[in-house]
Amino acid sequence: MKAVTTSPATEPDTAPVDVVLPCLNEAEALPWVLARIPRGWRALVVDNGSTDGSAERARALGATVVREERRGFGAACHAGLMAATADIVCFCDCDASLDPSLLVPFVREVRDGEADLVLGRRRPQGRGAWPAHARAGNLALAGMLRRRTGLRLHDLGPLRAARRADLLALGLTDRRSGYPLQMVVRAADAGLRVAEHDVPYLPRTGASKVTGTWRGTWQAVRDMRRVLAEPPAPGGVSATGSFSAPQGANSL
């Protein structure tokens, strides 16, 4: 099913950065998230079959709404990537667990040619921000990623930035939970420089669609195992270190 994009009438033709926000029943969190999109950037809320009025609320708050009927985190993310037109594309969860204003230094690093793909390493803030089963699954995946690619990353979090052309060139195919991992694996295989920086991780609004239970977590791990089983492509690996992204940054 082809994604359908609807935009506010006042939206500019171009934006320096597009922020893809995969969304499934996140109406409660949307005001907080969209208020933190840096000024001048475009929010692409990808509605993945919400029944709580998320699409209508996002549109009322000035976001561009992309409808993707095929369920799946990867399907929503890729629909947003395909709808994006900016040179640099960011991704952020839509559940108020991550502040999109923290993407500003990520974008600056990509724009200045210091890295090709910048990831946020989640640092839990308060009890319940990152359940034990989700942390365990993430730790296991980080180890498998290191063995597969040589990248010494600590997290495969959803907060990230890269050039749109680089992401499209990766030919991403996963449409489920493996999409974020496949992006990193194929970036490493292609020799892209991958950086990881600390970001605060807040308790999310509502229940997780992926890692809210042990069953959901390990289903995601199985999805990602399939990604890691892909044969390596020719290329090199480059990973850089971490720093704590400044909080509250909202402009380039």
How would you describe each model-predicted region?
Residues 1-13, 150, 172-252:
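Hydrophobic helical membrane-anchoring modules
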Residues 15-18, 35-45, 53, 63-64:
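Short loop->beta transition adjacent to catalytic acidic/histidine clusters or analogous donor-positioning motifs
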Residues 23-39:
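Short, well-formed alpha-helical segments that are part of the catalytic scaffolds
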Residues 26-29, 50, 73, 99:
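Donor nucleotide-sugar binding loop of glycosyltransferases
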Residues 28-32, 52-61:
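Acidic helix N-cap motif at the loop->helix transition within catalytic regions
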Residues 47-55, 96:
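A conserved acidic beta->alpha catalytic loop
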Residues 69-71, 75-83, 100-177, 204-214, ...:
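Acceptor/aglycone-binding surface of glycosyltransferases and processive sugar-polymer synthases
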Residues 89:
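Short aromatic/hydrophobic "clamp" motif used to bind/position activated sugar donors
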